[in-house]
Design a protein with these regions (language model features):
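C-terminal capping/gating helix-and-loop segments adjacent to ligand/active sites or protein-protein/ligand interfaces
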Residues: 244, 368-371, 388-441
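Short, solvent-exposed loop/beta-turn-alpha elements that line the ligand-binding surface or hinge
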Residues: 130-146, 216, 234-257, 307-308, ...
Length: 445
């Protein structure tokens, strides 16, 4: 992600092309305007992978300002000189307020960035990409967890299954940064099991080092909790919970372990004093000053950390007993409006986004590649190389899980308040899990 600090890793920021960089301008994703929905989408008709031979213009609307989509558009034009990509940027607040009206207009764009599904799907404002996915073989090109985040039935409610409505243009992932200087001084190797991770924390504490840097003012202890749950229970099970699948629960072995672990780390002094009053940018700043062996955070801050600690930071996915890699993350994604004039051309541009050429562009502009993650490389010693390696492992093991905060409209607030209370000793692990599960139940009734 671009080296910018997320304004807020909340449900809105995350849903907005994640936090993909929060200042990529994708942080104000509140509910899209309900107006402008059409009663039924026009017939999709047959699809084609053939590109036009004459001059053509592809119109793309977006609130992504990291430069990724624009650079992809320029590369696509260079490859197909007869095709002009008209990239139209709108600031996030105005974009979200006006998107549904744009989609329902007779002058609808050919591609539109989606921050979330829901009213766009239920209102028949975007077309299913199922036929294009079959035509281009996307199911074989993408790990299923990448595409499943943009699948939903016609009512747009439960995610993870049903029709495909958008295709990704770049990802971000949460993992664990570590200070190589502190690790080397203490003789700590990158942990490969949960037990080794715990041992590293104990060793750091005994040596007078802060084991885990954390800013929890905005609820980022959820990164710790979800990382542990994802690794323990597996991506499929936790993905069901995020997607609202009936019967899913965090009252699981992984959930119990995660809640107990966060409470235990707080009691043992593994977390900084005042964590509940520090925001994410503050914790990143403290980490780059040498305060903390580990930091749970996303790829969007990798370049910032790199600049402050060149060659002195590592990155890993939270270790699991199974050896399978999991990671929290989501993507910037684009949909084809139901009223698009050039849907076949739009789909061709979406397919271009999973090429090796696109991977280089995505990586260079701060995103993790949609595909071909093993082909990208940053400067020697850059932590982005370790982030890319972790991302490739997550893809290989089909281990991507959307942010817990994205499961319903109020979960971010619950994660924030309950995480602060658990760290502050004002609630217990069981009560913490009960609160999260009760919120989930209300949100998915």
């Amino acid at each position: 992600m671009p080296a910018r600090t997320p304004r807020r890793t909340t449900r809105t920021a995350v849903t907005c092309a994640l936090l993909v960089a929060a200042t990529t301008g994708l942080t104000a994703c509140g509910g899209l305007t309900p107006g402008g929905s059409s009663k039924s989408a026009p017939s999709a008709g047959p699809v084609s992978t053939a590109l036009p031979t004459g001059s053509a213009t592809l119109t793309v609307v977006s609130s992504e300002n990291a430069g990724t989509t624009k650079a992809l558009a320029e590369a696509f034009h260079a490859k197909h000189p007869n095709i002009t990509v008209d990239f139209q940027y709108t600031g996030p607040d105005d974009y979200d307020k006006s998107l549904n009206l744009k989609l329902s207009s007779d002058q609808a764009p050919d591609l539109a960035l989606l921050n979330k599904l829901g009213t766009t799907v239920k209102g028949n404002l975007v077309r299913s990409l199922d036929d294009y996915a079959r035509a281009y073989g996307w199911d074989a090109k993408y790990p299923s967890t990448e595409l499943d985040q943009w699948r939903a039935p016609d009512d747009g409610k439960q995610l993870g299954a049903g029709h495909l409505w958008a295709a990704p243009a770049g990802f971000s992932v949460v993992g664990v940064y570590y200070n190589k200087d502190i690790a080397a001084k203490l003789g700590i190797q990158p942990p490969t099991t949960p037990a080794e991770f715990e041992a590293a924390l104990a060793k750091a504490k005994a040596a007078g080092e802060l084991p885990v840097q954390l800013g929890n003012l905005q609820g980022h202890s959820s990164f710790i909790v979800q990382s542990i749950i994802d690794a323990a229970d597996g991506a499929a099970k936790t993905g069901d919970w995020v997607n609202g699948k009936s019967g899913a629960t965090l009252k699981s072995p992984g959930g119990t372990a995660a809640a107990n672990t966060l409470a235990d780390w707080a009691k043992k002094g593994y977390l900084p004093d005042g964590a509940n009053g520090t925001d994410l940018p503050g914790s990143v700043a403290d980490f780059t000053k040498g305060k903390g062996l580990f930091l749970f955070n996303g790829s969007w801050d990798a370049q910032k950390i790199d600049r402050a600690m060149p060659g002195r930071t590592g990155f890993l996915t939270f270790p699991s007993e199974s050896g399978k890699a999991t990671g929290i993350g989501t993507s910037v994604a684009y949909a084809i409006p139901a009223k698009a004039k050039n849907p076949d051309l739009a789909a061709a541009f979406l397919d271009f986004m999973n090429t090796s050429e696109a991977a280089r562009i995505q990586f260079d502009t701060g995103f993790l590649p949609v595909a071909h993650a093993d082909t990208v490389k940053g400067a020697d010693g850059s932590v982005m190389n370790e982030v890319a390696k972790g991302w490739a492992a997550v893809n290989k093991d089909n281990g991507l899980v959307n942010f817990f905060a994205n499961t319903d409209a109020t979960m971010n607030d619950t994660l924030t308040s309950q995480g602060q209370q658990l760290i502050g000793g004002k609630t217990g692990p069981e009560q913490y899990l009960d609160a999260l599960q009760n919120d989930w139940t209300k949100g998915h009734q």
